[in-house]
Amino acid sequence: MAKGQSLQDPFLNALRRERIPVSIYLVNGIKLQGQIESFDQFVILLKNTVSQMVYKHAISTVVPARAVNHHQHAPGAAGEEQGEAEA
């Protein structure tokens, strides 16, 4: 499970840290907008006029309002992931 979150956590953390507005699309088609206040393994707290707890299993897509640099890996980590993908 840690392998699956090696991309998700840095991405969500960059959105939270830089306070980038996001659109979150749910699996039922509803669009939520706001800023990511916090997140854990199961939920995202989305803040707009109120804070909403959104369960990750209900999320289809997270769309940032602008480009985000989320590659905060240790040196060599990206190369290791590419090597595994090619094998």
Curated annotation (Swiss-Prot):
The organism's place on the tree of life at top rank: Bacteria
State the protein's name.
RNA-binding protein Hfq
A cellular-component GO term for this protein: cytosol
Task: Please give the organism.
Answer: Aeromonas hydrophila subsp. hydrophila (strain ATCC 7966 / DSM 30187 / BCRC 13018 / CCUG 14551 / JCM 1027 / KCTC 2358 / NCIMB 9240 / NCTC 8049)
Entry annotated with the keyword RNA-binding: yes
Task: List each copy of the Sm domain by range.
Answer: 9-68
Q: Where are the transmembrane segments?
A: none
Q: Describe the function of this protein.
A: RNA chaperone that binds small regulatory RNA (sRNAs) and mRNAs to facilitate mRNA translational regulation in response to envelope stress, environmental stress and changes in metabolite concentrations. Also binds with high specificity to tRNAs.
Q: Which UniProt keywords apply?
A: RNA-binding, Stress response
Pfam hit, one: Hfq
Q: Which family does it belong to?
A: Belongs to the Hfq family.
Give the GO biological process terms.
regulation of DNA-templated transcription; regulation of RNA stability; regulation of translation, ncRNA-mediated
InterPro entries associated with the record:
Hfq (IPR005001), LSM_dom_sf (IPR010920), Sm (IPR047575)
Q: Which GO molecular function, any one, fits this protein according to its record?
A: RNA binding
SUPFAM superfamilies the record matches:
Sm-like ribonucleoproteins
Q: How is the subunit organization of this protein annotated in UniProt? A: Homohexamer.
Matching PROSITE patterns, A to Z? SM
